């Protein structure tokens, strides 16, 4: 689980970098709306939400209350490039 949480943190940092590239600054983020996480896992692994806590906890640490979000945690048998975690997110930004 700990390695998965580290992978989730790395994935969310990548998403934050994409936000900076798109809007110029994380200061424009007014709310993290949703995080959708996919965990590359075997058939006997059931702790997908615990893995995604790595990403969710980082968002709350970084953004405070506006970092709280809805979340989906799904286990899958494979991900592109055999990555451990893939994340998409919905973010509200201000002008």
What does each of the following model-derived ranges do?
Residues 1-95:
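Short, polar/acidic, helix-capping and beta-turn segments at strand->helix junctions
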């Amino acid at each position: 689980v700990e390695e998965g949480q580290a992978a989730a943190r790395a994935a969310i940092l990548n998403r934050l970098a994409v936000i900076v590239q798109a809007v110029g600054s994380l200061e424009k983020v007014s709310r993290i709306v949703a995080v959708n996480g996919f965990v590359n896992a075997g058939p006997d692994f059931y702790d997908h939400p615990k893995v995604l806590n790595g990403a969710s906890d980082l968002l709350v640490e970084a953004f405070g209350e506006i970092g709280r979000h809805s979340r989906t945690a799904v286990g899958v048998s494979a991900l592109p490039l055999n990555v451990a975690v893939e994340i998409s997110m919905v973010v509200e930004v201000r002008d």
